């Protein structure tokens, strides 16, 4: 990976994206809500029951600019769910700021193993025994 791309990833201005798609939220409090899902690449938790093990290796997914990610979400749904992998391996501030400028409701699905970044309307915390949440995960 070149230095420029690495810097964009560190700043959260670009992210490894496995997939992004419009669908109906199928679980939890917002079940049945039309949503746009953004699935980030990268996860070091290693849950043996994971249904998206393909997301674990961040290097196997394209690095996409936040501008492009947000552009693709425009007009599809007012609810955006960021999931993974483990999205909090990355700085979510630029993505959520850009989504908020479009008046999107931002939801995240996380293990809580990394510090919370971003501006979220809904946090779905799913602790994992393999890598426990950091204490701050319970304070937000």
Give names to the regions the model predicted.
Residues 35-37, 49, 79-81, 105-107, ...:
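Structural preference for beta-strand elements that scaffold enzyme active sites
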Residues 1-62:
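N-terminal [4Fe-4S]-dependent radical SAM core
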Residues 88-140:
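Conserved AdoMet/S-adenosylmethionine-binding subsite of the radical SAM
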Residues 57, 87-88:
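Glycine-/small-residue-rich active-site loops that bind phosphorylated ligands and cofactors
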Residues 51-81:
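Conserved alpha-helical substructure of the radical SAM core
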Residues 83-85:
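Active-site beta-strand/loop signature of hydrolases that rely on acidic residues for catalysis
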Residues 31-32, 73-76, 100, 116-119:
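Flexible, charged surface loops at secondary-structure boundaries
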Residues 26-27, 69-72, 112-116:
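Short, flexible, glycine/charge-rich loop motifs used to bind or transfer phosphoryl groups or to couple energy/partner
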């Amino acid at each position: 990976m070149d230095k420029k791309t690495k810097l964009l990833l560190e700043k959260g201005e670009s992210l490894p994206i496995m997939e992004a798609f419009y669908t109906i939220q199928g679980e939890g409090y917002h079940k049945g809500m039309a949503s746009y899902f953004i699935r980030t690449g990268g996860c070091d938790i290693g849950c043996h029951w994971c249904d998206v093990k393909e997301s674990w290796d961040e290097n196997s997914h394209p690095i996409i600019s936040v501008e492009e990610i947000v552009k693709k979400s425009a007009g599809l749904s007012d609810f955006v769910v960021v999931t993974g992998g483990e999205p909090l391996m990355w700085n979510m501030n630029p993505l959520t700021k850009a989504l908020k400028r479009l008046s999107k409701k931002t939801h995240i699905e996380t293990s809580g193993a990394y510090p919370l970044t971003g501006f979220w309307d809904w946090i779905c915390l799913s602790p994992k025994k393999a890598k426990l949440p950091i204490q701050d995960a319970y304070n937000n």
